[in-house]
């Protein structure tokens, strides 16, 4: 069944919820839905208490390492870490308590060309079983998707296709896919992308972007046959949202899987 995957998004050392498509190097045009007065480790401890697994900490730009390390220390082995990951620092993040490292931008050249030798270096450094590839994407005019990097600012040369998923699945444990065009907007999920991922990903995959209610988790479960997990961010009450009580998602995750619609 589709599970809720918790998140901790860090920007300038603070827990925030940001409209994904507004991130930029200059910071101009940034739309922030929520900035917490609580530290990252508060949320990590909450997820640990409620036995929520497979969540992630994402560092959006510089200045987040200390906050990320505190979160990982609060829930050792319970959270993945992404943002600025490369073959050099990935082992250190695992040592700091991350269950997996999540990588996107480092797999590409500055102009967005996929570099398979870097993926091989990461697999060598941490092992396939500790690696998550972030294939966060944006829509293209032809109705498909292209993987984006640099906080979703730069389109790469890697289309999100069945062949891409099949090709990369042998080098990682999971995929993480933010639908950047709807991320942080609480206006609904990409209902075409969800079943596409379910049909074509040979390994576990987590979708993020636009989930706004508990009904959206049920919708994802229906659309994917329970094969894709979902992250809920800006709609959560613990992140200032009004669409989804966190307590309801804890109950959802711990319910009898036989009750799931498949």
Which residues make up each language-model segment?
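Short, well-ordered coil/turn segments that N-cap beta-strands
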Residues: 1-4, 51-54, 75-79, 98-99, ...
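Conserved, mostly hydrophobic/aromatic
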Residues: 9, 47, 55, 81, ...
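Conserved anion-binding
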Residues: 11, 15-26, 94-182
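N-terminal active-site wall of soluble small-molecule enzyme domains
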Residues: 25, 36, 40-94
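Glycine-rich, proline-tolerant flexible connector loops at the mouths of alpha/beta enzymes
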Residues: 51-67, 105-113, 177-186
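Catalytic cores of alpha/beta
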Residues: 66-101, 192-230, 241, 246
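C-terminal helical cap(s) of enzyme catalytic domains, especially alpha/beta-barrels
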Residues: 113-125, 217-262
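Charged helix-capping and loop-helix junction motifs
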Residues: 115-120, 157-162, 187-195, 245-249
């Amino acid at each position: 069944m589709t599970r809720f995957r918790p998140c901790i998004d860090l920007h300038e050392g603070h827990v925030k919820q940001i409209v994904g498509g507004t991130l930029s190097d200059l910071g101009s045009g940034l739309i922030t839905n929520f900035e917490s007065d609580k530290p990252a480790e508060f949320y990590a401890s909450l997820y640990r208490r409620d036995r929520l697994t497979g969540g992630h900490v994402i560092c959006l730009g510089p200045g987040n390492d200390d906050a990320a390390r505190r979160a990982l220390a609060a829930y050792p082995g319970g959270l993945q870490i992404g943002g600025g990951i490369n073959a050099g620092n990935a082992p250190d993040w695992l040592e700091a308590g991350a269950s997996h490292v999540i990588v996107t931008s480092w797999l590409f050249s500055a102009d967005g060309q996929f570099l398979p030798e870097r993926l091989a270096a990461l697999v060598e450094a941490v092992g396939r079983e500790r690696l998550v590839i972030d294939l966060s994407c944006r829509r293209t005019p032809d109705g498909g998707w292209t993987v984006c990097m640099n906080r979703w600012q730069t389109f790469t040369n890697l289309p999100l296709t069945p062949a891409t998923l099949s090709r990369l699945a042998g080098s990682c444990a999971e995929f993480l896919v933010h639908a950047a065009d709807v991320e942080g907007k609480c206006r609904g999920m990409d209902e075409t992308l969800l079943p596409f991922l379910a049909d074509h990903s040979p390994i576990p995959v987590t979708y993020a972007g636009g989930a706004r209610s508990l009904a959206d988790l049920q919708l994802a479960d229906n659309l994917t046959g329970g094969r894709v997990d979902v992250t809920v961010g800006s709609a959560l009450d613990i992140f200032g949202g009004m669409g989804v009580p966190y307590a309801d998602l804890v109950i959802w995750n711990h319910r009898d899987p036989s009750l799931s619609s498949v």
